Amino acid sequence: MSTAGDDAVGVPPACGGRSDAVGVPQLARESGAMRDQDCSGELLRSPTHNGHLLVGALKRHQNKPVLFLGDTRLTGGQLADRISQYIQAFEALGAGTGVAVGLLSLNRPEVLMIIGAGQARGYRRTALHPLGSLADHAYVLNDAGISSLIIDPNPMFVERALALLEQVDSLQQILTIGPVPDALKHVAVDLSAEAAKYQPQPLVAADLPPDQVIGLTYTGGTTGKPKGVIGTAQSIATMTSIQLAEWEWPANPRFLMCTPLSHAGAAFFTPTVIKGGEMIVLAKFDPAEVLRIIEEQRITATMLVPSMLYALLDHPDSHTRDLSSLETVYYGASAINPVRLAEAIRRFGPIFAQYYGQSEAPMVITYLAKGDHDEKRLTSCGRPTLFARVALLDEHGKPVKQGEVGEICVSGPLLAGGYWNLPDETSRTFKDGWLHTGDLAREDSDGFYYIVDRVKDMIVTGGFNVFPREVEDVVAEHPAVAQVCVVGAPDEKWGEAVTAVVVLRSNAARDEPAIEAMTAEIQAAVKQRKGSVQAPKRVVVVDSLPLTGLGKPDKKAVRARFWEGAGRAVG
């Protein structure tokens, strides 16, 4: 084996250990202060980051299993050794300090080692969604200036890597998690084999300034061209601290990771290790496999997006598998159907906890605890975190009265560093001392927030504002409806007509009289609950709703169906 000398892995050559950043806005800029000044003074009160948390947790649990790797279990100490080997490999391959690296992979345990190396060292990483298009992937890699791309070497990603090499000027090499396929022999290196060449070294977190750029997360693109949200050392560490302080965790977490580690799934890595838990990683979400693993591995916690929860509810095995070990199911990323949530609570018990956030203030803006899931609060996203300033503001930046609709605005160390290479967009979103989330909400007398919609999704019909989310909550209560998406369709009289696009439950009647009756019942229910302005002018039945790569209903795609050829556009 090669060695990297006697130095501990992760210790920077100087106090900064900074990665280069180009085009970072004022909110997260590169500064030479820590390199140019006396290091001890700068670091005296410098906050810890996720690398410190992870390295410390792995040491604390060095003899305890923390990760399944195939048929074997890795202890905290063994995982730290693997991470140290990956750090040495990244530095040797020119994919470590000072460069931008992309990741395209299905879920696999090695991805957590790659993520761990990035957290410990402060590397700048950008994850690509496994289901993203070639055009989206090329845009992200070009925008982020990616020079190396790590891939899971399955045929789909090998083909994608070859195409990206043709379209991304900055892309110089491919790193595979496993043997290099013949098609990539000329340009790829087996990252796992390279890491195995090195002797494990003591794992030590690099000292990073709070505004260190450690990742770019690209927005889903449902409201326009994807934007690179700058993840900083401070932002991610704040998120993790809030997860640990305010969220409910099993005493002995056995966490099933079945959502993409390229996105929200990875946010549960460090907290689970800190809690002394063990992680089981599934390559992808499959309802039968998830239910089997929960039973056989006695899983105590997992994280799902709503569409995954619906799939579990609709699978026959959810009635026969022993799921009694499951203590906590975190859910978020998109609005949940309150009727289906109530069904899930009846089926699985009061084990559900909702989180709300966005890339610009990740995951922890609000939290709806398990015990707060009573019938009247199933449409709530919870109470605001105590570790950030959260307010509902009107269009003039003033707080709204309780019960009135305002935009959720956030400030504090949770905030991301702005948008990559988009100073004007950064100034529009991070302004007047607040992050303006674009989400509209009301607050009840107990301090619980209820999101009514996105600012950009609001429908203007006949001069009145309609919030689709409120209409969707009523439509979802109809017994024939499995999923619903409400959008504004062009209308000569009203400007926009409230239109409900629904997916029927499997046992619902689909003949014309049944559809007509359902439409009338939905219109009457919305009119009674919300008013005649909110009542859908049309109810359109479809086989399925288009989803984004993150599993959210793609309202932009649904809306486009009605606006194509209209001669004007909304949103």
Curated annotation (Swiss-Prot):
Name of the top EC class for this enzyme: ligase
Q: Which reaction does it catalyse?
A: a medium-chain fatty acid + ATP + CoA = a medium-chain fatty acyl-CoA + AMP + diphosphate; a long-chain fatty acid + ATP + CoA = a long-chain fatty acyl-CoA + AMP + diphosphate; hexanoate + ATP + CoA = hexanoyl-CoA + AMP + diphosphate; dodecanoate + ATP + CoA = dodecanoyl-CoA + AMP + diphosphate
Pathway field of the UniProt record reads: Lipid metabolism; fatty acid metabolism
Sorted keywords for this record are: ATP-binding, Fatty acid metabolism, Ligase, Lipid metabolism, Nucleotide-binding
The family database entries (Pfam families) matched by this protein are listed as: AMP-binding (PF00501), AMP-binding_C (PF13193)
Q: Which GO terms describe its molecular function?
A: ATP binding; long-chain fatty acid-CoA ligase activity; medium-chain fatty acid-CoA ligase activity
Q: Quote the EC number.
A: 6.2.1.2, 6.2.1.3
PROSITE patterns referenced in this protein's UniProt entry, alphabetically: AMP_BINDING (PS00455)
Q: Which domain of life is it from?
A: Bacteria
Which cellular component appears as one GO term in the record? plasma membrane
Chain segments carrying region Disordered: 1-22
Q: Which family does it belong to?
A: Belongs to the ATP-dependent AMP-binding enzyme family.
Q: What does this protein do?
A: Catalyzes the activation of medium/long-chain fatty acids as acyl-coenzyme A (acyl-CoA).
What is this protein's name?
Answer: Medium/long-chain-fatty-acid--CoA ligase FadD8
